[in-house]
Amino acid sequence: MSPSAANTPSYDDFALALEAQSLDSQKGQLVRGKVCEYSTDGAYIDIGGKAPAFLPKREAALHAVLDLEAHLPKDEELEFLVIRDQNEDGQVTVSLRALALEQAWTRVAELQEGGQTVQVKVTGSNKGGVTADLEGLRAFIPRSHLNEKEDLDSLKGKTLTVAFLEVNRADKKLVLSERQAARTALVREIEVGQLINGKVTGLKPFGVFVDLGGATALLPINQISQKFVADVGAIFKIGDPIQALVVAIDNTKGRISLSTKVLENHPGEILENVAELQASAADRAERARKQLESQ
């Protein structure tokens, strides 16, 4: 065999190279291509393989496409996701819709990671809550996480500001919360050293839960008085209005810690006359703020 013949690719070499090129386009891979032909149920996409890929009409976008030629001009190169391996003719099936959904899950995960709130439009309701659309994904907002819990049908078509409760790409589960979004917004407005007004909503051995009108704060038992407190129920009752100083904020977890002991003029004052301390809380807060700043 001559050197030139040895270096000349054989028919088998071409066949192997062509097969390798076809195998490059497998399910889950991204390919680039242009429309080369339209059909009644889709379009054929030139991706440089053995055969053009097929794009079903239902996979052309997240929404229904009526005019495929207007939606996908022939001279426009786009990126597609392979959703079905090649058939016996070497043709793979591709999708723009599946690619858009994958990109949407990535964006939503990034928004959740950043603690962002988003706006969604309510698309429907059931006994458990409402459904909404976010980036083309179907989301669910439980009834317990809505501001309006009674007439859910009235929410259809409305835009809500929500936070993320769960983003699960594998299970295609996207759960949102309107109440948490409101709480997040309120927490961001509150500052350490601020005197807040609230209402007592819970009494526990470890402290008092205070509703701030959209967010719940905790007044720990060791922050009630400079003196030992044996029973929070001896000082506060459910429904009591309360003023307290914000001493700590955890923006990541949405937690607000309060204190009334910093408002006392002497240890145990709140145990003796809680009404007097609350009535003059604004004047006491200025002194307490200076003490916090000096620490």
From Swiss-Prot:
It holds the Pfam family S1. One of its GO terms (molecular function) is structural constituent of ribosome. GO terms for cellular component: ribonucleoprotein complex; ribosome. Coiled coil: none annotated. The keyword Ribonucleoprotein applies. SUPFAM superfamilies: Nucleic acid-binding proteins. PROSITE patterns: S1. The keyword Repeat applies. Residues 28-97, 115-179, 193-261 form the S1 motif domain. Keywords: Repeat, Ribonucleoprotein, Ribosomal protein, RNA-binding. GO terms for biological process: translation. InterPro entries: NA-bd_OB-fold, Ribos_protein_bS1-like, Ribosomal_protein_S1-like, S1_domain. It comes from the Bacteria. Signal peptide: none annotated. Belongs to the bacterial ribosomal protein bS1 family. Binds mRNA. This is Small ribosomal subunit protein bS1. The lineage of its organism: Bacteria, Bacillati, Cyanobacteriota, Cyanophyceae, Synechococcales.
